[in-house]
Amino acid sequence: MAKISRAAYADMFGPTVGDRVRLGDTELWIEVEKDYATYGHEVKFGGGKVIRDGMGQSQRPNTEAVDTVITNALILDHWGVVKADIGLKQGRIAAIGKAGNPDIQDNIDIIIGPGTEVIAGEGMIATAGGIDAHIHFICPQQIEEALMSGVTTMLGGGAGPATGTNATTCTPGPWHMGKMLQAADAFPMNLGFLGKGNASLPAALEEQMLAGAMGLKLHEDWGTTPASIDNCLNIAEKYDVQVAIHTDTLNESGFVEDTLAAFKGRTIHTYHTEGAGGGHAPDIIKACGELNVLPSSTNPTRPYTINTVDEHLDMLMVCHHLDPDIPEDVAFADSRIRKETIAAEDILHDLGAFSMISSDSQAMGRVGEVVCRTWQTAHKMKVQRGPLAQDSERADNFRAKRYIAKYTINPAIAHGIAHEVGSLEPGKLADIILWRPAFFGAKPSLIIKGGMIAAAPMGDANASIPTPQPVHYRPMFGAFGRAMQQTRLTFVCQAALDNGVKEQFGLQSPLSACRNTRTVTKKSMVLNDLTPQMEVDSQTYEVRANGELLVCEPAKVLPLAQRYFLF
């Protein structure tokens, strides 16, 4: 049998079992665990290559063949690091395995026919589209920024640059909810909106659910009292939706123990659980030890660096409508920004005690940096803490799976949309991001939305080939017209679907109901389910998990930073 070198094989078909790939300029390496290819029978498109009539391309009609095949991609997902072909059909993932022509090849999972388009995945990393579950919908331009970074689902609240939206992730009331659902039809992004949950009686919350909310948000700026928490969670239990909470920084209506007691063991998603983004000062971080709490971070504190504390004070004053001339406002800001808890947050992510990472877009968060901040945190922890026990000096597969789960499958599970998005698995929406390894985490090479290319770096449109400068991210055909509407989802609750919200507001995009949100616990958070016994010293702000003091140094330099964004 003819053989080629491992290096030559990787150049031609991408890495195979035992090969390692560096993620961007981080110190993280992943190793291929499985390759679905049959050596010598790989499919590849191009002049003189395999996917041609009667060779790798069969005669099968499109009823049997896939619409699109991504060839020889290296998949990085919470479930594995595998090399495979990915078949797409009707905007969803049809199969992951071996593609080709079953008339002349054995063990074919994905049939290539005359109706099949090809995307070359050789040498590329494929990940699921990211999910940002903490969005202030302040301006529509956020959506393009997020899409170009590798995010394909945005969940949160707001109604434009109103003062309330600038501070809180709530789309309040049926009128605003309806208008935001109508606006959602215009964007190549899966969207879901959270109603305002701050009320002590149920009627005003129920009408938001029937108007199309996919969940509710409790925010301290609207008064997150034990009574409003209890009422909001009662509605969530009734309508099977998730509640997100920004707790009481000032401890006006109670302390962290009172808030945890108000949960009454019911599931809740705690936003920026470290507290710099808001929450009981100084000890909201203790919530990550509770079984019913699904803790997330927002990206300005990811990871802890020499600049983190300084920039937060200015952000806080602007976002929460504070006045630097009022001493009480300054004291409020100072109470929220603590280097000790921010440093501990790094380690809690590495331990799997914090389960999700999101942005907090334009409200103390950067919407285009969820992905890169996640991998910067993973890198910092690898450098400072070494390989995880489940990994070796050779590769960081477990750590990579843990961190990618924080912005893909775990927010999907938390908000009841994992049946649609959050991972690369058959049956799910084909929201797929392709990365060149050298640019992993910073700049995607292709953004596939609902099976159609929605965005990509693209050169001069008047050039003779696609690559001449200036190359920058541009919307593609999947971002336009009816095609865009049919390759995205708007998430609502089942009651809104039953109430005819699609017809009521004349919505064009498919709607999908969230489900199974009330049975989720911390143990449902994939690879991020640790519930440590948490202690916080109220004077020194020292944080301990299971008795261990959590301390790390701020980073002075990070990967996936300046060298990637000069242009």
From Swiss-Prot:
Residues modified to N6-carboxylysine: 217
Identification of the protein by name: Urease subunit alpha
Protein family membership: Belongs to the metallo-dependent hydrolases superfamily. Urease alpha subunit family.
Localization in the cell: Cytoplasm
GO molecular function list: nickel cation binding; urease activity
Gene giving rise to this polypeptide: ureC
Enzyme nomenclature, EC number: 3.5.1.5
Post-translational modification: Carboxylation allows a single lysine to coordinate two nickel ions.
Named cofactor requirement(s): Ni cation
Lineage per the UniProt record: Bacteria, Pseudomonadati, Pseudomonadota, Gammaproteobacteria, Oceanospirillales
Keywords for the protein's UniProt record, in alphabetical order: Cytoplasm, Hydrolase, Metal-binding, Nickel
Binding-site residues for Ni(2+) 2, renumbered to this chain: 217, 246, 272
Residue ranges constituting the Urease domain according to the UniProt record: 129-567
Superkingdom of the organism of origin: Bacteria
Active site, UniProt feature: 320 (proton donor)
Cofactor note: Binds 2 nickel ions per subunit.
UniProt pathway: Nitrogen metabolism; urea degradation; CO(2) and NH(3) from urea (urease route): step 1/1
Positions contributing to substrate binding: 219
HAMAP family documented for this protein: Urease_alpha
First-listed, main subcellular location of the protein, grouped into a coarse class: cytoplasm
Binding site for Ni(2+) 1: 134, 136, 217, 360
